[in-house]
Amino acid sequence: MATTTDESLRDSDIPLEDLIQPKVRNPWFAKFDRLVYGVIGLGLFLVLWWWVVASGQVSDQYLSTPQDTVKAFVDGLSDGTLGSQIWPSVQRAVVGFVIALILGVALGVLVGSVRIFQKLAEPVLLFFRNLSLLALLPVFVLFFGIGEESKIAIVVWACFWPIFVNAVSAVSGVERLLLNAARTLGAGRFYIFTQVVLPAAFPAIFPGIRLAAANAFTALVAAELVGGAEGIGIYINTASLRYQTPQMYAGILALGLVGIIVNAILTVVEWRVTSWQRGLTSK
C-alpha cells in the first residue's frame, strides 16, 4: 500500500515542493525581517567602506573612513559649522516642495479631469519633464538672480513635474465603475470629485510626492552651488575645495539623513491618508 502511495505521488503533476508542509517562520522575524536585513546590509556596507580606505585601495584624501566621517559630522553639529548650514537648506527645500505640491496637485487634478486639457498638455509635458535641470540653471539665474528666489524656483521646478504627472495619471485613471456607481446613487459633480475622484487618486499621487521630496534636495544642492553664503551644498563644495575630506562626507551624510527623515514623514502621512485603501485590499 505504501508503495502504491509513493508511486502515485511520483506520477502526480503536483510539484514536490507543494506536497511538503512549508516551514513556519519565526513571528518576530516575520515582523522585523526588513529591519534585520537592513541593519545587516548597512553593516556590510560600512565594513566594505572601512576596508577600501584602510587597505589603501582608495586614498583617504578622496574617501574618509566611516569613523572619521561620523566624527566630523558630530563635531560639525557640536560647533555649529555643519548645523548652521543644514537649516537654511531645509527651509528652502520645504518652501519649494510645498509650492510645487500645491501647484502640482491642483493643476494635475484639473488637467486629469478634462480630457481636452490632457491632449493639450501632453506635448508640453513630454518636452519639459525631460529637460535637464542643470541645463536650466542659467535660465533661473537670469530670471531670478542668485538669491533665495532662484534657489526656491529651482526646487519648485524639480518637484513640480513628478507630482503633476502622477496627479494627471491618477485622476484620469479613476475607474469608471466608481464614477457610474456614484452617479447612479444620485451624487452630484462636486460630491463625486471630492468623495470619489480625489480619495481614489491619492494613493497613485503619493509616489510622485515622495519622488518630488527626493528631487528637492538634489536640486537644492545644485542651486546652492550657483551662489550663496550658506547651505549644505555650499558646505560640501567648500570642504571639497579645501580638501577637507571628512567634512565633505559629513555634509553628504547630513543630506542623506535629512532625506531619510523626510521620507519617513511622508510614509506616515501616506499611511494615514490611504488607510481606507488598506481596509479594502487587506494591505
Positions of the model-derived regions?
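Transmembrane alpha-helical segments of polytopic membrane transport and secretion proteins
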Residues: M1-G41, A264-K283
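Membrane-spanning helices that line or support transport/gating and their immediate boundary helices
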Residues: A54, V109, I116-P123, N166, ...
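Transmembrane-helix boundary motif in ABC transporter permease subunits
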Residues: V95-L125
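C-terminal transmembrane helix and the adjacent membrane-cytosol boundary/short C-terminal tail
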Residues: R115, P207, Y249-K283
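Generic hydrophobic transmembrane alpha-helix motif, especially the helices
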Residues: L126-P162, S169-G173
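Transmembrane alpha-helices
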Residues: A153, W157, R189-A223, A250, ...
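Short cytoplasmic-facing helical segments at TM-TM junctions of multi-pass membrane proteins
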Residues: N166, A170-L211, I236
